[in-house]
Regions:
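Hydrophobic alpha-helical segments
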Residues: 1-181
Length: 181
């Protein structure tokens, strides 16, 4: 994974260049994260997409059936497999902001099997890795392992999180969006 040396393929739009509705998203992101991620500065070129993605990510990565910090670590792990330094950095920061420890963040980026995770959390990371290779790897045998430790809502969130972070790093890398400072 290497950072971007070149300019983004689509310009980053600053707050004074966007509609009031998108400015509201920028304000919410700034309040929540302390920064407006560069991905949103590119998505702002298509307001309906920026609004939809913001709503999707808020509902996906917030505390729900699974804790937000864990879903951010899943996003970090998948982003690492996608070789997206931007997404690894962004989701490591979000995991930290939502309560993940530095040891957990480091383990999610490395040997999670030896990390400070429950067996269920390790199984979730294995699920993300299998899904990354092929959805067919979530076969009946593996799915029965998930069902043994996760509720249906948790399984849906786990798979949706892992699947979503197959998309976002690809978007970022294809458009050469620079890592948010």
């Amino acid at each position: 994974m290497e950072g971007k040396a070149s300019a983004p393929r689509v310009p980053l739009l600053e707050r004074d260049e966007v509609s009031p509705e998108i400015a509201g998203i920028y304000d919410a992101l700034l309040k929540q994260r302390g920064v407006v991620p560069n991905m949103f500065k590119v998505l702002a070129h298509t307001p309906v997409l920026a609004i939809g993605m913001a709503g999707f990510l808020k509902s996906l990565l917030g505390d729900s059936a699974l804790p937000g910090w864990y879903k951010e670590l899943l996003a970090t792990r998948v982003s690492l497999m996608q070789q997206s330094s931007y997404a690894v950095s962004a989701h490591s920061l979000s995991a930290r902001q939502k309560g993940a420890t530095e040891v957990q963040i480091t383990a999610a980026k490395g040997d999670f099997e030896s990390g400070p995770f429950s067996e269920a959390e390790k199984l979730g990371f294995r699920c993300a890795e299998r899904l990354h290779r092929s959805p067919k790897e979530i076969d009946e045998g593996f799915f029965s392992q998930l069902k043994a430790v996760y509720s249906d809502p948790q399984i849906v969130e786990l798979v949706a999180t892992a699947a979503a972070f197959e998309l976002f790093p690809r978007l970022i890398e294809a458009l050469q969006i620079p890592t948010t400072p």
